[in-house]
Amino acid sequence: MTHTISGQYGRDTIVLETGNWAKQAHGAVVYKSGNLVLLATVCAADDAKEGQDFFPLTCEYTEKLYSVGRFPGGYFKREAKPPEHEILISRIIDRPIRPLFPEGYFCEVQLQVQVLSADGDVSVAGHALNAASVALTISDIPFNGPIAGARIGRINGELILNPTTKEIVNSDLDLVVAGTKTHIVMIEGEAKELSNEEMLSALRFAQKHIAEFVTLQEEYAKQIGVVKREVKLKARDVELLAKVKEYAFAKLTAANQTPDKTVRNKEISNVNKDVVEFFKQTVEDADKIKDIKTYLHELEYEIVREQVLNQGVRFDGRRLDEIRPISVEINPLPGPHGSSVFTRGQTQSLGVVTLGTGSDNQRYETLEGQKEKSFMLHYNFPAFSVGEVRRSSGPGRREIGHGNLAERALKLVLPKSEEFPYVIRVVSEILESNGSSSMASVCSGSLALMAAGVPIKGSVAGIAMGLFSDSSGKYAVLSDIAGLEDHFGDMDCKIAGTRKGITAFQMDLKVTGVSFDVLESVFEQAQRGRFHILDIMEKHISKASDSLAGTAPRIIVRNIPKDRIGELIGPGGKNVRGISELTGAELYIEDDGRVTISGSNQESAEKAAKMVDGFFAEVEVGKIYEGKVKRIADFGAFVEILPGKEGLCHISKIDFKRVNSVKDIVKEGDIIRVKVLNVDKTGKIDLSRKDALEEI
């Protein structure tokens, strides 16, 4: 049976349909907004796998290029490995949905959102999250939703729900928010140095609209008559749990007071082994032994949270708002164009900057067409950074997500391309990690950019905030959380910015939402922490280096008429190749007539720029030029005085004395000085070597 409902979501009319397509999925909805058509489907296994002790959720967002009437690129002409922007939207769907499944529900769930028809004006991220929530809400799969997503922009101080792709270009805020009817559950985005108050205002605006779409989903589920599956939870052995707590509580409490991550992990491991060995004497059932390991983890969770909430004590002895010790190194590597090492506690990031030219732009394909990026930040998280052994492979979703967050934090303080025409790549190598490595990447990246001579608007620092709360409403906000506090806490909120304001943010929860009072505390405490970090960073470097590294390319930019680009390129690229061969410089020509000239040194770049100028310079009568003899005739020599512009130096104008043969004085390939005597209406140029010699 087909069910349809429609409703207004800001300026958009949303139509939801189910019961016609993908009927064998456990939940499926066709979601429409304008010409945008999404298909969201979800399926779940009937039972958890034997021994499963975590929730295996997979969220996949896919853009089909047929949705805009285009073929995929490449040899096979079909969609292949998901590009970075699809992975990022997949994460936007995953992160707010994951904590809303019942605790202890370990059945495998696969959620897919596909773009079947695209609308160039419609930004997809918020709609994709909405479609995913609808599919789950109308399915029989247990889910403590619905939630809704909203993308928020701001133009001239006015907040906009779900801005168009054109509007977002002019917005000083790009925020994606997910929430329930009453609480925010996820935020992500970037801003042009917005204040805490402006950010909170945008979140309140989003929450109001989110509640509207949540209500629509509730009405839809009621119309369909959804009946959810019963959650099958494993029975707990209360008696065994009490015995484990009695034996292990003091031991785990002592082990948790160790501030060093490596030592602490070893001590916790030793306690766990001791407890298991002790109970093996009286417990023979292998499943009960597995339960003991689960109870030990729960006990550790209880100990860490009790210390923070009731004693105001963190495992490493810090105050709730205290930041770990910070150290900074500037340009520790001699080869790269700029580098830094930022260490905060046991988290360490090596930031490295490479400056490139237009040909180094990253090109990628989206539903809107081919795009280019001139700034990129790549985040690497090797196994050794956490003392583990695992196979090295390409970047996973986590690395891509962390790199994107750090990239957005730094992107908005970069100079305009007119001021600094370089392509910039920042790499963050995580050398060791104990929480907040993405924010360490922001700090090391900011330092390395200044060290490389990139004139950024100001230093950028990032901090990760945590939250511990209980059912009574009591809560504690933690600054600069370590890995343990991230693992056992309720929130991981990353905020990056300058002294003027916030540039990037990301918040994930393990609870069903936080109030605005809590968010206000988080933002205020994060700002104090950010300023503290900036104070330390700016003691080491507070402005861009005065000069670029010797190995960095030297770039000169020229702008030429768009309708004359072909003249510069020449037949088959002849002119551009000629300039490169003569000067050693490279030319990158854009469709708007912008020409980026890069050389290994300033002389090379200037020589090439002079040649480019020559293509578009007008020949001046009376001016002396240095030109190359291109051809010799009986009556004179043809000399190229500007690229593509030849004139005739008649035999009578070659020398002061009588010349019997032109070849007696000049040869092909010679560089000679000539004076322009005349340019006629047809463009013929009359040259004189003799007149030029007279003026030496």
From Swiss-Prot:
Entries under Gene3D superfamilies matching the protein: GHMP Kinase, N-terminal domain, K Homology domain, type 1, Nucleic acid-binding proteins
Stated name of the protein: Polyribonucleotide nucleotidyltransferase
The family this protein is said to belong to: Belongs to the polyribonucleotide nucleotidyltransferase family.
Domain KH: 553-612
InterPro entries attached to this UniProt entry: ExoRNase_PH_dom1, ExoRNase_PH_dom2, ExoRNase_PH_dom2_sf, KH_dom, KH_dom_type_1, KH_dom_type_1_sf, NA-bd_OB-fold, PNPase
Enzyme class: transferase
Organism in which the protein naturally occurs: Leptospira borgpetersenii serovar Hardjo-bovis (strain L550)
S1 motif domain segment(s): 622-690
Gene Ontology BP terms: mRNA catabolic process; RNA processing
SMART domains assigned: KH, S1
Entry-linked SUPFAM superfamilies: Eukaryotic type KH-domain (KH-domain type I), Nucleic acid-binding proteins, Polynucleotide phosphorylase/guanosine pentaphosphate synthase (PNPase/GPSI), domain 3, Ribonuclease PH domain 2-like, Ribosomal protein S5 domain 2-like
PROSITE patterns for this protein: KH_TYPE_1 (PS50084), S1 (PS50126)
Cellular localization per UniProt: Cytoplasm
An example Gene Ontology molecular-function term: polyribonucleotide nucleotidyltransferase activity
This protein's GO CC annotations: cytosol
Annotated keywords: Cytoplasm, Magnesium, Metal-binding, Nucleotidyltransferase, RNA-binding, Transferase
Reactions accelerated catalytically: RNA(n+1) + phosphate = RNA(n) + a ribonucleoside 5'-diphosphate
Binding site for Mg(2+): D486, D492
Cofactor requirement: Mg(2+)
